[in-house]
Amino acid sequence: MRVLTIFLLFMTSIFAVQIKDVANTVGVRDNQLIGYGLVVGLNGSGDGTSSKFTLQSISNLLQGMNIKVDPNDIKSKNTAAVMVTAKLPAFAKSGDKLDITVSSMGDAKSLQGGTLLLTALRGIDGEIYAIAQGSISTGGLTPRPGGAGSHSTAATVMGGANVEREIPQNFSQNSDLTLSLKVADFKTANDIERVLNTVFGEEVAKAIDSRTVKLKKPEDLSNVDFMARVLEQDIAYKPQSKVIIDERTGTVIAGVDVEVEPVLITHKDITIKIDPNNNAVANQNEIDMKDGGFVDPSSNTLRINNAKSTVANIARMLNKLGATPNDIIAIMENLKRAGAINADLEII
């Protein structure tokens, strides 16, 4: 039976974090790269003859090696056309390794065990910034409809690309230094201003709005030294609750205290009722699932004690009922849409 893996984040409501954990330095960012390539060596799980662009790509590749083949004569199913994406970090240097994501474009069944051939990765300006090549592994997953393992047509290759071109940077000469909060919040912006001005003993920070803090470097410090000191300062921070669901691996990551409000929803043949009664007990036809949950097998209804209605508990109980990861994802989305989950929901 396919199950969803649940990770709980145990944390206090308010704790100290470094500024670099809650804010980015404006101008210091990743750049997206993309390329088109071929994965070969697949065990009959590649693109079929209906993926004409794959056949044409194979023909073009062979023609570059002085081998002429008509695309219509190619019948191999051991090759798949893929899009390759990567992030080029700020200040990346020639020779640095990048992680890449390889995703099938055609009707391939799996990329497992294949090899990505030399693929140029370009930026938005059309220039080549990295070259990718290497063996593909999808983590040993096999395609299974409706649950974890259904994404063997995409894979991440660690260190699968080499940086060939650097993006020019003038950070050391930049006089306009700005912090941008990852999550807009007036209190956090104000706290950053207060802490930095106290630490440096002068007005080096000014909160402009809920996301922006302008910085003014002291004359006796370089940009690098100044930003290093800025980003390591601690501030009091209350994180925004979030539930993250990895659709590919079937993993739920949630804070231990992410609660679900009283609600009644139905998905396919499963009904979920969050009982506002904190002292609910099992009815005559219900089975006690422990952890405050009761299931009625005749109607496939899951009733949960409001005091125990957290995202983690609901996901765990749905697992016990045999719900697929895709079902659980859909239920979480519906709970969020109904305003019952007091947290941001992110599907990756």
UniProtKB/Swiss-Prot annotation:
Keywords: Bacterial flagellum, Periplasm, Signal
GO cellular component: bacterial-type flagellum basal body, distal rod, P ring; outer membrane-bounded periplasmic space
Signal peptide: 1-16
Top-level taxon of the source organism: Bacteria
Chief localization: periplasm
Single GO term (MF): structural molecule activity
GO BP terms: bacterial-type flagellum-dependent cell motility
Subcellular localization, as worded in the UniProt entry: Periplasm; Bacterial flagellum basal body
InterPro entries noted in UniProt: Flag_FlgI
Pfam families listed in its UniProt record: FlgI (PF02119)
UniProt xrefs under NCBIfam families: PRK05303.1
Complexes and interactors: The basal body constitutes a major portion of the flagellar organelle and consists of four rings (L,P,S, and M) mounted on a central rod.
Function: Assembles around the rod to form the L-ring and probably protects the motor/basal body from shearing forces during rotation.
Family membership: Belongs to the FlgI family.
Name the record gives this protein: Flagellar P-ring protein
Naturally occurring in which organism (per UniProt): Campylobacter jejuni subsp. jejuni serotype O:23/36 (strain 81-176)
Lineage: Bacteria, Pseudomonadati, Campylobacterota, Epsilonproteobacteria, Campylobacterales
